[in-house]
């Protein structure tokens, strides 16, 4: 996918990129790869690249406050491909079919906002449940956010885990 998108595969990416199926055993449908470029508690900011296969979903989740910091706020910018971001609000029934069947009955977030290359979408409120699904080509997404303490991460799917 990186080669198809003409994305440079640096030594840092080769060394530090991680790949997750969230313990669900269905990586092609529900999973992600990525790299944390920075996660600064002292300055309260975070930089992350998300790598998604075509139609792949990050499990629905929220970020709660912890002893180390406030709930995480985040924004997303597709750099290659496109994504469907799902969050709270009025449902967009015409786009619910983008959610993998294995997750469709488990998610709370039913408001979809498609994002094309270089459009930026945002979490609509702190602690809101949300997720994204890659478009048909897959997606490389830059995520901007406040400090991320993994202790505050909560999944709506009780089987999902890091």
Per-segment meaning from a language model:
Residues 22-24, 35-38, 62-64, 99-102, ...:
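Intrinsically disordered, low-complexity segments enriched in polar/charged residues with Gly/Pro
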Residues 53-54, 71-93, 97-99:
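Glycine- and acidic-residue-biased ligand/ion/polar-headgroup-sensing regions
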Residues 35-47, 60-78:
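A short beta-loop-beta micro-motif enriched in histidine and acidic residues
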Residues 59-61, 68, 76, 85-86, ...:
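Short beta-strand His + acidic residue motifs that chelate non-heme Fe in jelly-roll/DSBH
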Residues 90-110, 129-162:
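Double-stranded beta-helix
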